[in-house]
Amino acid sequence: TFSLTPEVELQMGFGNPLTKRLIEHNGRMAFGSDIESAMAADMFSVIRTSLQAVRHEITLESYEKTNKPPDKMSVSSRNALEWATINAASILSMDNIIGSISPGKKADLIMFKKDEINFTPTHDPIASILFHSGPRDIDSVIINGSFVKRNGNLIDKKLPSLLEKLNESGKRIVHDFLAR
């Protein structure tokens, strides 16, 4: 079982993410974010980067063996979505509670603004979400049956005070760093 942070692995020069090797060995994987000061905590980017990296490796391997690209890409957008949802839930031993839309599971849902230009035209909704969306395209989020974001806005009443504390913390860290 591995938690992959493909953006960081590529950006820091650690080589190819483990995605392809884990697929080949039926390894279990989930995604994470790392080094938030250098990378956005955006799971769409993490999933997209991992999918693109594994497809790149497959294509290079095909060129090395046949001098041409693969006839068909063996790793789909649906595969990547499953890595981030039901597979991640399974790794946490929570796949009976979360990770898919099923009766009896918690209602954890993300709803997208379908009328955005980056989704038009949409022939494959999963590919459109993974390749063309980001946090800005999320209309609503439901966690355990309750809205936490609606109509594009976070609805936590504590958010303004949390943002204030975050700004104060950031100022203190920069001040302390510069004072050294």
Predicted segment positions?
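Hydrophobic beta-strand scaffold residues
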Residues: 1-2, 29
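C-terminal active-site-proximal or functional interface alpha/beta core segments in diverse enzymes
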Residues: 3-16, 40-41
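His/Asp/Glu-enriched, well-ordered alpha-helical/loop segment
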Residues: 17-116, 132
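Active-site microenvironment of metallo-dependent hydrolases
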Residues: 78-180
